[in-house]
């Protein structure tokens, strides 16, 4: 029953504890746990039976004793205190300030699992979000309300890319408030300091809310951290009409925490030991994005995950790909070449790109230019493999130009400085500069009128 306190903890294992002899306990109910020394921790009911409750402890079960630990069931679900004062602040994985500032005075308290959204109430994602990164803006455009994950690998610079996107992202042509909600799960102290420094030194912290769960924090916190972040994002987007970009890193650490809890509960494992309900669980995070009819605000998600062994068929990226609307893939080969950001545009995809670009959104030539750049780069990459077999001497003059185009595309279009913020017009013009490397007869995917208007050869004549 709500408010009842029990000292009937029968077992503690991993992040879980079993409380026996309970009555009227509900799934998802918040509990307060008190140790013999008076220390208080929070937990949540994972499973409720007739007279037994399985509780997950957010701060971990270290130093808890079955004989001296008491548990009080509050009768409430986990709620997040929300306020506009959270902008510019840094919190730990369960929402406590860690920046030395005061506690937040909440304007409201929201359920951490969010309010259910009628699918009919959803508005289709549209409108271009400029990240300042050519490989994304030009080739795999991010659209307001989209879910576009970044598939990375261990040792690749996804943290730098996340910080750069958080710093540079903006909605063009509108006087709208833009905010970033950044949630990091299972990161090291070094990574946490990098993110803090990056946000604070560039002033991006003023429009951001940071949730940082460190590697030595209890793994169970990682289950709550992204939901905390999304609850705050929903508040900013749908109560204050803000355009919110949510960056979640690293979703692989989240899935590992999910597997740890599943193993502790002795559930039947699914693929590679992950719980069979991981798809559903990930969907409860990724589907908390988008736009709502009648509301000006939006939530755009960019989850980041490191693929174990660079395996894109691993259950985490595999299931993520089913739920989200594309992927940005980082390449170890490009990283070895010293190219930052090492975005491989060929396996990357933004399924909603067509709805956020073109006349009135970016520029009229954008869709066809992106197709032409993609086709030319794919041809150049294919010819590299051929050269490895037959040598460059066997290639035609046009083939050699494709090879040169592929090299320049990587060095000039994909590659850019960490502090370089390219506008979409700079990106598109750069694309045309590179296409000038090829014979005009090879530009078969672009209308003649766009060639006459934007191709450097004709543009310079017009000037």
Curated annotation (Swiss-Prot):
Topology within the bilayer: Peripheral membrane protein
Molecular function via GO: ATP binding; proton-transporting ATP synthase activity, rotational mechanism
Gene name in the database record: atpB
Protein name: A-type ATP synthase subunit B
UniProt-listed HAMAP family: ATP_synth_B_arch (MF_00310)
Keywords: ATP synthesis, Cell membrane, Hydrogen ion transport, Ion transport, Membrane, Transport
Binding partners and assembly: Has multiple subunits with at least A(3), B(3), C, D, E, F, H, I and proteolipid K(x).
Primary subcellular site in the record, as a coarse category: membrane
Cellular component, GO annotation: plasma membrane; proton-transporting two-sector ATPase complex, catalytic domain
Organism listed in the record: Desulfurococcus sp. (strain SY)
Function statement: Component of the A-type ATP synthase that produces ATP from ADP in the presence of a proton gradient across the membrane. The B chain is a regulatory subunit.
Subcellular location: Cell membrane
Example of a GO biological process term: proton motive force-driven plasma membrane ATP synthesis
Keyword Membrane: yes
Source species taxonomy: Archaea, Thermoproteota, Thermoprotei, Desulfurococcales, Desulfurococcaceae
Similarity field: Belongs to the ATPase alpha/beta chains family.
